[in-house]
């Protein structure tokens, strides 16, 4: 990350989705990047830190200006997408600001509820700025509700930020998870003997 980007990512969300913002921020910052991947891609960071998320609803001109500064010093914008965030003016404003900064290709929609481009407005999860992109600008959303689960969605976000294929990162993630599980099984079996 260069000096221009104080934050690896900025999480934009509505207060109704705060638990998702908190979960995502924590899991990104504490994700252990597989060492084999770092060897294969030496340009990758060792950690995904810091990740910015604001814990309260936005109000006040000074606060908006401060958040725009944080947004402009972020490498990626992760938008927690739900019907609540689709209706939140400040979520849309943050997406618009990021696009205006020339970083529209670094927006990652993280879908937690609703449907992108829904026929029923009550089910729409994308804020207007994401719905109104041209066909060439359209962004693929990462849906946490898929049967693969939250861990799968987290790895998908990281793979997207790193510009590596999902399956490459997922295989290494699963290998590490199995290795840790086997270590815990070995430790538990020692205590059971």
Predicted regions and their residues:
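Redox-cofactor binding/interface segments in oxidoreductases and associated redox assembly factors
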Residues: 79
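Short mixed-charge
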Residues: 30-51
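C-terminal interaction surface of TIR/SEFIR-family domains
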Residues: 1-29, 49-50, 55-73, 83-89, ...
